[in-house]
């Protein structure tokens, strides 16, 4: 699902497994400056508080260094050397089951939880991690946390949206839900405690609505939605002149270069045929209105049309292009209202 705001476009997962269904599998551990950010360092020693949980998540999600080396990784290594940052190039740590070399695509019994988890299939490097792993190599939550929880008796209700959470007289809460795919009867639940874990765009809008509702959760903080952080992504597409090289082979994000203490860029790919994001290769055209941005796009295309010729001719953008994903950890935030 994509949500569009004035300053950012957000891609997020909706389904059993949430964002794990569409994320790029990477599991970096933040650097010290993240834990020492001025906005929250006074609240706790976050590094020591969170370290055990990073370790648990790494184990549960089977995160390991990417063992593959494809053309995109070689290009990133060359860029790192050109920038004088060769020592700051590394393979990503990813939640993917690779299996034994030579047995890619082969199904094996659960390799993670002493046989209590589902069988898995070794990664075939098809590049389709973010559009839904076709083989069962990506360690999405439905293959670990949720799978094991169901085995212990937890009931997972798919196609269900929480519409309200209200305090219950005498203590606890009432959770109101509706089916998200059919006009069925609404179902209410009661609980002593409620954990909100719907991601930013599944949680904050619901809480804002409940704060505004006198019968909801009106005592929530007035600062709700004030400090929403992003990873400050910039997406840069590069298209080859021909289809001599298959840039789609590999995993979604396979290697990374730390350009300085606060920023890095990664090589990103989609699987063959995943061309929905082809418009991202159009020129960046800022403006105060949609009409102004469209006009600026047309102007740039007229002036520099040759640069975009390869994009127009590409039979399959996913296999004929690669994406450079730039991020930074410096503090920056949005307000959601």
Residue map of PLM features:
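Charged, glycine/proline-rich intrinsically disordered loops and linkers
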Residues: 1, 97-122, 283-308
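Redox-cofactor-proximal catalytic regions of oxidoreductases
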Residues: 1-68
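A short alpha-helix-loop-beta-strand transition element characteristic
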Residues: 2-8, 13, 63-67, 85-97, ...
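FAD cofactor-binding and catalytic pocket of flavoenzymes
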Residues: 4-10, 19, 23, 43, ...
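Short, solvent-exposed loop/turn and secondary-structure capping segments
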Residues: 25-26, 34-35, 101-102, 205-210
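Flexible loop/turn segments at secondary-structure boundaries
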Residues: 30-31, 97-99, 164-166, 202-204, ...
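Conserved redox-cofactor binding core of oxidoreductases
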Residues: 45-152, 157-159
């Amino acid at each position: 699902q994509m949500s569009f705001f004035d300053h950012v476009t957000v891609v997020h997962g909706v389904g059993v497994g949430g964002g794990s269904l569409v994320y790029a599998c990477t599991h970096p551990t933040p650097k010290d400056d993240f834990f020492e950010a001025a906005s929250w360092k006074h609240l706790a020693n976050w590094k020591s508080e969170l370290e055990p949980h990073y370790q648990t998540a790494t184990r549960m999600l089977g995160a390991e260094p990417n063992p593959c080396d494809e053309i995109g990784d070689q290009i990133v290594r060359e860029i790192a050397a050109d920038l004088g940052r060769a020592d700051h190039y590394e393979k990503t740590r990813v939640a993917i089951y690779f299996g034994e070399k030579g047995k890619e695509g082969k199904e094996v019994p659960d390799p993670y939880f002493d046989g209590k988890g589902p069988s898995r299939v070794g990664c075939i490097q098809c590049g389709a991690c973010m559009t839904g792993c076709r083989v069962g190599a990506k360690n999405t939550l439905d293959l670990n946390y949720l799978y094991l929880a169901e085995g212990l008796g937890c009931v997972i209700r798919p196609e269900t949206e929480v519409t309200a959470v209200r305090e219950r007289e005498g203590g606890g809460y009432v959770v109101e839900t509706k089916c998200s795919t059919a006009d069925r009867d609404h179902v209410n639940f009661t609980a002593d405690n409620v954990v909100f874990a719907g991601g930013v765009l599944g949680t904050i809008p619901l809480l804002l609505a409940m704060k505004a509702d006198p019968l909801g959760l009106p005592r929530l903080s007035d600062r709700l939605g004030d400090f929403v952080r992003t990873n400050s992504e910039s997406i840069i597409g590069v298209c080859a002149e021909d289809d001599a090289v298959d840039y789609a082979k590999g995993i979604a994000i396979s290697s990374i270069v730390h350009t300085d203490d606060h920023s890095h860029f990664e090589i990103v790919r989609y699987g063959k045929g995943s061309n929905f994001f082809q418009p991202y290769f159009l020129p960046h055209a800022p403006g105060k209105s949609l009409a102004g941005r469209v006009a600026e796009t047309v102007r740039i295309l007229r002036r520099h049309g040759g640069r975009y010729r390869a994009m127009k001719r590409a039979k399959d953008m996913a296999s004929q292009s690669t994406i450079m994903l730039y991020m930074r950890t410096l503090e920056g935030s949005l307000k959601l209202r």
